[in-house]
Regions:
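Short Gly/Pro-enriched loop/turn and capping motifs at secondary-structure junctions
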Residues: 107-110, 123-125, 146-149, 155-156, ...
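Double-stranded beta-helix
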Residues: 16-58, 122, 154, 161-204
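Short, structured patches in soluble enzyme cores that scaffold and shape functional sites
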Residues: 12-14, 20-24, 57-60, 70-76, ...
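A short glycine-rich, His/Asp/Glu-containing loop-to-beta-strand
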Residues: 52-100
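Short, conserved beta-strand element in jelly-roll/cupin
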Residues: 71-74, 93-125, 133, 141, ...
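A short secondary-structure junction signal
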Residues: 29-34, 67-70, 79-87, 114-119, ...
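Conserved metal-binding segment of the jelly-roll/cupin
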Residues: 1-13, 23, 133-154
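Generic beta-strand structural signal
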Residues: 6-8, 14-18, 66-70, 99
Length: 204
């Protein structure tokens, strides 16, 4: 992260695909380089809801002005962003955060093009209803509403970059589950995490 009106140069000796998440900043935070070894990594869910989350600016000591960013890696056939949840009102347990998913899907046998499915549906006071196929390079904007699941088709591992921003100055991620589906979390206690995870190296 960098303060406003700061020029930053990015280089890679081996080449790279670089994503530059951004949002409107209202305060200046210290310039911060977060090497791979300091990225917060974790496994969420269990069984067919297993996925890996790499936190770049979410739940760690990277200071931002409104911006949150992480990436989610989901093995083919699994569901992520599940149970469905929302963050479209400001309360003690939730923050208003608009969200963008940028997707990449691992090709299958013979370079078969993979795909995934994304669901968004109404939350109280917010009318939205989306169920769409997504492929590599697609972006879905989630301004409000319950979102999830993100479903990786069997055989096609799913990646998405998750970028959020909202009006609150505290830059924290607080969300609430759809109460009809939050019970699903209890079922994870009796299931193993998918053995295909982690998909990238984990940090302690």
């Amino acid at each position: 992260t960098a303060p406003r009106h700061t020029e930053v140069t990015l280089t890679s000796a081996d080449g790279a695909r670089i994503a530059l998440p951004g949002s409107k900043a209202t305060t200046d935070k210290p310039l911060r380089y977060c090497p791979r070894s300091e990225v917060g990594t974790g496994l969420r869910g269990a069984g067919p809801s297993s996925r890996q989350v790499n936190n770049y600016a979410l739940g760690n000591d990277v200071e931002t002005s409104h911006l949150l960013a992480c990436e989610v890696l989901t093995p083919g056939g699994n569901w992520s962003s599940y149970p469905p949840h929302k963050h479209d009102e400001h309360t003690e347990v939730e923050r208003v955060l608009e969200e963008i998913y940028y997707y990449q899907v691992r090709a299958g046998e013979g370079d078969a093009e993979g795909f995934a499915l994304q669901r968004i549906y109404p939350s109280p006071g917010h009318d939205i209803d989306v169920c769409t196929e997504v492929r590599g390079g697609d972006v879905v904007v989630m301004p409000y509403g319950y979102h999830g699941p993100s479903v990786a088709a069997p055989g096609y591992d799913l990646y998405y970059l998750n970028v959020m921003a909202g009006p609150a100055e505290d830059s924290v991620w607080l969300m609430t589950d759809d109460p009809h589906h939050t019970w699903v979390r209890q079922t994870w206690e009796g299931q193993e995490v998918d053995p295909r995870l982690p998909m990238t190296p984990m940090n302690d």
